[in-house]
Amino acid sequence: MEIFPAIDLKEGRCVRLYQGEFSKETVMNEDPVAQAIIFETFGAKRLHIVDLDGAVAGESLNLSVIERICKAVRIPVQVGGGIRSLVSVEKLFSVGVDKVILGTAALYDKPFLEETVRLYKEKIIVGIDAKNGFVATRGWLDVSEISYIDLAKQMEKIGVQTIVFTDISKDGTLAGPNVEQLELLQKNVATRLIASGGIASIQDVKKLNDMNIYGVIIGKALYEKTIDLEEVLEVTKLC
């Protein structure tokens, strides 16, 4: 299982939100580059970064910070948030990003998604963020009428190989992942799944590992030390 420490960027800082609410942010580190180095130092093999400002604006607004992170660490970095054009995708790859996560564009711009998957194949990940089972977009501010299962099926048909699934109600809560929704996803698609939202303990990670979930994104639990990064990396290596 892959472990992805999370860095959420807002106004150039590393923050955490509660249930996706921008009004409920906590600054975890004023220096995201330093935070990335900390994660790498403690053994992280890859990083998950979200440009929260970009997710709302529809374009990358923390590109310079992302570039500095990519230059500061030697591990692969995947980035999502506001990536809705081929130019944005190419810019991220040009500054050293390993994989790009598309969210809103996956729902509303299928030709763009199909083109990027054709060009970059496994380098393109789709992020599906769900609120009460329906896909939320544009920084989680809009909730669509399409279910997360239906969108996942569409993504698989297009050729998407990896999906990041987030239950927004769990995000930043340390309440545990939404195992039921993840199990339903597994029954409906064969894509690799990365679970995000609510991960609070080593036991949560072990549960997802037992389900053969490909990867887990861990944010708040690392910052609040309910999960030790070195320990969780060792545990998943032994499983």
UniProtKB/Swiss-Prot annotation:
It catalyses: 1-(5-phospho-beta-D-ribosyl)-5-[(5-phospho-beta-D-ribosylamino)methylideneamino]imidazole-4-carboxamide = 5-[(5-phospho-1-deoxy-D-ribulos-1-ylimino)methylamino]-1-(5-phospho-beta-D-ribosyl)imidazole-4-carboxamide. It is an enzyme of class 5 (isomerase). GO terms for cellular component: cytoplasm. Pathway: Amino-acid biosynthesis; L-histidine biosynthesis; L-histidine from 5-phospho-alpha-D-ribose 1-diphosphate: step 4/9. The active site is at D8 (proton acceptor), D129 (proton donor). It comes from the Bacteria. Disulfide bonds: none annotated. Its EC number is 5.3.1.16. Keywords: Amino-acid biosynthesis, Cytoplasm, Histidine biosynthesis, Isomerase. The keyword Isomerase applies. Belongs to the HisA/HisF family. PANTHER family: 1-(5-PHOSPHORIBOSYL)-5-[(5-PHOSPHORIBOSYLAMINO)METHYLIDENEAMINO] IMIDAZOLE-4-CARBOXAMIDE ISOMERASE. This is 1-(5-phosphoribosyl)-5-[(5-phosphoribosylamino)methylideneamino] imidazole-4-carboxamide isomerase. It comes from Bacillus cereus (strain AH187). The lineage of its organism: Bacteria, Bacillati, Bacillota, Bacilli, Bacillales.
